[in-house]
Amino acid sequence: MSYFPWLTIIVVFPISAGSSIFFLPHRGNKVVRWYTICICLLELLLTTYAFCYHFQLDDPLIQLEEDYKWINILDFHWRLGIDGLSIGPTLLTGFITTLATLAAWPVTRDSQLFHFLMLAMYSGQIGSFSSRDLLLFFIMWELELIPVYLLLSMWGGKKRLYSATKFILYTAGGSIFLLMGVPGMGLYGSNEPTLNLETSANRSYPAALEIIFYFGFFIAYAVKSPIIPLHTWLPDTHGEAHYSTCMLLAGILLKMGAYGLVRINMELLPHAHSIFSPWLMIVGTIQIIYAASTSPGQPNFKKRIAYSSVSHMGFTIIGIASITDMGLNGAILQIISHGFIGAALFFLAGTSYDRIGLVYLDEMGGIAIPMPKIFTMFSSFSMASLALPGMSGFFAELVVFFGIITSTKYLLMPKILITFVMAIGMILTPIYSLSMLRQMFYGYKLFNVTNSYFVDSGPRELFVSICIFLPVIGIGIYPDFVLSLSVEKIEAILSNYLHKSFS
């Protein structure tokens, strides 16, 4: 038990400090922007300090643990803790949110509310990754839905209200299943209800009940991840949202579903996970092919990038379904890797849109010469997305491949078939990535457009791009930087899983 409440401060600080934005003097938007960036930087430094000096990498147990009784009648505790599974996504959240606030610099309309909503999302996302109580996990899971809805409906494109409504219907609909499952697990088999994750993990449930719980939780995570066929909100949301919101969606929000799948479904419901994992493997494989095949047909380049996110999340699902330490480590590496790459692609898509005012690829062409910096960064991140060796995407997908091949759960022929289909998906990725680059940056089309605002990337935009590009290269060259965070915890999860599923 931690004596100093590091995690409570880390979770509460963004939203509480963000509340005082409304009391700042109305002297333009610069004060609000700098205040928000300072909060994000301070939060990131605080998180990094706490994890560097108070987190032991070789300890698979929960660390920095805090437990405060909150609502007695429900046995509801403010229970927080960090382990190897959650430290990576938590640091990713801090990094991407800080850069997203810098990316949101051009936002001038209602900037106080805009920046407050971004900070509220920050608290909700870190709270989700560090919760050790099922009800607290659900509250934090829901906390970031309202900010996304408002950010989308107030600062989105022409169809923003349609996209925002679709987003809230899908995510709130999925959360109903989460809400039903949480008290069900808490109340089952005990005179005193408990929502503690550790206590729930040590319980055993009847097979039929475990399958019902698993399926309910899975629907909630399938919407958020997203997993087909519950993915259709994502292209519409990305197509209309402001690019700083897209960075948070692609970089962090989608990863919460995959995290919940391991944290709740695999750790708490191992028998059901053993039954569902072959189906997860099939769904993940179909998802890679389906999204990679659908992406080239999207005329809107933001929707094309959104479908690439759906395809890449298929690798994460397959890694989780492989039930091997290599597959799970690959899934976590893919979560971190795609968090950087997805956020960068949407940021660059947004900066391109700011300049040319076009989203349809058939109207674009020839912007490489007037905007060489944007072209260079867009090309670099597209290469990372198609898993070029030396970049983070390559190693993440390679580790997932080896995870399937070394899995003892599946027979040889299904493993060969799945790896073959995954390989086809990896071949399809360059097709939509490179064709998007060709349509946007090559040719002469836009040279004929009069009064075009052709200004290349400024220092702020270049800084954001380089800040994301460095970890993409760093992880590609030295993936142990990320794998060392989770390897001990993954071993512990698998040993507990195998012990419980065969007992």
UniProtKB/Swiss-Prot annotation:
InterPro entries: NADH_Q_OxRdtase_chain4, NADH_Q_OxRdtase_chainM/4, NADH_UbQ_OxRdtase, ND/Mrp_TM. The gene is ndhD. It catalyses: a plastoquinone + NADH + (n+1) H(+)(in) = a plastoquinol + NAD(+) + n H(+)(out); a plastoquinone + NADPH + (n+1) H(+)(in) = a plastoquinol + NADP(+) + n H(+)(out). GO terms for cellular component: chloroplast thylakoid membrane. Coiled coil: none annotated. It is a multi-pass membrane protein. The chain crosses the membrane at residues 4-24, 37-57, 87-107, 134-154, 167-187, 208-228, 242-262, 272-292, 305-325, 330-350, 386-406, 416-436, 462-482. It comes from Drimys granadensis. It comes from the Eukaryota. Pfam families: Proton_antipo_M. This is NAD(P)H-quinone oxidoreductase chain 4, chloroplastic.
